[in-house]
Amino acid sequence: MAAAAGRLLWSSVARPASTIFRSISASTVLRPVASRRTCLTDMLWSACPQAKFAFSTSSSFHTPAVTQHAPHFKGTAVVNGEFKELSLDDFKGKYLVLFFYPLDFTFVCPTEIVAFSDKANEFHDVNCEVVAVSVDSHFSHLAWINTPRKNGGLGHMNITLLSDLTKQISRDYGVLLESAGIALRGLFIIDPNGVIKHLSVNDLPVGRSVEEPLRLVKAFQFVETHGEVCPANWTPESPTIKPSPTASKEYFEKVHQ
């Protein structure tokens, strides 16, 4: 009797979830591409509970980690208005901020990309390049760049936009929403030796700070150069800590007078 009741309870709970999953998958697959794109955009930006049932990331297959080498990537990018084949190897000897965004011609995404582009010179000043990645084609990237900012476009770009049309880069970096076929807002800081120093992932509706990755690159470089460590909210003007029980007291005595 208890077993039968348990099966009945499970079927009553499980059926709505599976029904939701099927309805989302079927409607997504059967619609034309443009309609499918609009459907995904509306659903993913609305934070509706159905999306939580349907979408899982690729992180269960592979999750890059801080201190590990970044997964190799290559693809076609838009660089200074031209198409160019690009790979991780092109950034040896430099820091790289590699950030993923869901789709071209959306809402939050252009605000992030434009903000990074406007700060490009500050990244270049610390030997760091910035590359934005989505599952759109390089043709879509170029069309978006050629769209005025007042119309939701990108305008002139000082950073690179990389195409991940096969979704393999997003998958390798563990940020791909498999069912939706788009990437979460993942951001990776990769050092000149190809090692991941930082990673973060935002849910779709919230954009990222541009100042924080720049601060982190400067902090990692300071540690490499000086051998001291950076406390919370460190900036280049802030005191740092000598990493030993005795020497660290100099910092703590200074900030806790």
Curated annotation (Swiss-Prot):
Active site: 109
GO MF annotations, alphabetized: cysteine-type endopeptidase inhibitor activity involved in apoptotic process; identical protein binding; protein kinase binding; thioredoxin peroxidase activity
InterPro entries in the record: AhpC/TSA (IPR000866), Peroxiredoxin (IPR050217), Peroxiredoxin_C (IPR019479), Thioredoxin-like_sf (IPR036249), Thioredoxin_domain (IPR013766)
EC number(s) reported in the record: 1.11.1.24
An annotated GO cellular component: cytosol
Residues with N6-acetyllysine modification: 92
UniProt KW keywords: Acetylation, Antioxidant, Cytoplasm, Disulfide bond, Endosome, Lipoprotein, Mitochondrion, Oxidoreductase, Palmitate, Peroxidase, Phosphoprotein, Redox-active center, Transit peptide
Entries under Pfam families matching the protein: 1-cysPrx_C (PF10417), AhpC-TSA (PF00578)
Localization terms from the record: Mitochondrion; Cytoplasm; Early endosome
Residues modified to N6-succinyllysine: 84, 92
Tissues in which the protein is found: Ubiquitous.
Domain of life: Eukaryota
Single biological process term from Gene Ontology: cellular response to reactive oxygen species
Family membership noted in the UniProt record: Belongs to the peroxiredoxin family. AhpC/Prx1 subfamily.
Record note on quaternary structure: Homodimer; disulfide-linked, upon oxidation. 6 homodimers assemble to form a ring-like dodecamer. Interacts with NEK6. Interacts with LRRK2. Interacts with MAP3K13. Interacts with RPS6KC1 (via PX domain).
This protein's name: Thioredoxin-dependent peroxide reductase, mitochondrial
Organism per entry: Rattus norvegicus
UniProt gene name: Prdx3
